[in-house]
Amino acid sequence: MTTEQFYREIGSDYAAVLERLGAEDMIRRFVLKFLQDPSFSALEEGFAKRDAEVAFRAAHTLKGVCANLGFDRLYAPAAALTEKLRGRAFTEGADALYGEVAQAYRQLIDAIGRIG
């Protein structure tokens, strides 16, 4: 699958990402590099250890990466989770949002794996 097809599959705006990053090879490189991004692992760790500071920082970083790369379906729950954790506490609804982030993350990783 091409990078443009990948963006179509994940429901994101390839043209907007191309305008922001400037070249398809750069987009492809950053998309594939996302597989090595530690933000989601840090988020998992923050939730597992109930460390709201770690979880907040990880959610905030993940949100930013998703905004830059146009990963809209992961950006939305990551942004909501960031706001939920902004007070550095696991408030009501944080666990449910984490579940949404985890599901969107896994779907995105699966789609990235199909880039040819």
Summary of predicted features, one role per range:
Residues 1-57, 61-116:
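Two-component system phosphorelay core
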